[in-house]
Amino acid sequence: MDIKNIPEHELARLKEKAKELAGSSTEYQSEYSSLLTRRVNHEPLQYIEEYIPFYSISLKVDERCLIPRPETEFLIELIKDNIKSPNKILDVGTGSGCIALMMKSLFPESEVMGVDVSEDAIELAKENAKLNSLDVSFFESNLLDNVKEKGHDLIIANLPYIPTENLNELDREVIDYEPLSALNG
């Protein structure tokens, strides 16, 4: 990617991030240059900014998880419009925790758990729970292997779905930065 190919709205966001990081006006140019270099090298803007809005919460995102997609917000909408007050919710393949955290936000009386095969993703999901002051249990599990509790009213699984042979067709910012284990299905 060339700097000329970075959209104007992304440049504006990078400038804001540089202002946030710079301790003084003399450090601003260095920070901005560093952020531009990262973006030119195809690092996702969401990773550079570190936090993204997701539905009604804020999420920290980095290389430990897949960046939540608009389709995930659509899934939240479907659940919100069609499910009435589940008691126990399980999110399988939780990643950043976005689905589990939104379930707790939408259904505050529900017991919500999120599991993921990645220890790093679980760590990030716990950070996001703390960031949003939401009481959700997260633990490591390959699918349902370590899930001892039964009787969930709602089980959500937004699992990897891209066939191995199609991975090379993904954009560089996806294939070079996001965890392949969250994509390869």
Regions found by a protein language model. Give the residues of each.
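Conserved SAM/SAH cofactor-binding pocket of Class I
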Residues: 74-169
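A general structural signal for well-ordered alpha-helical segments in protein cores
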Residues: 11, 32, 42-45, 96, ...
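Phosphate/oxyanion-binding loops and surfaces in catalytic or ligand/nucleic-acid-binding neighborhoods
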Residues: 21, 38-42, 132, 162, ...
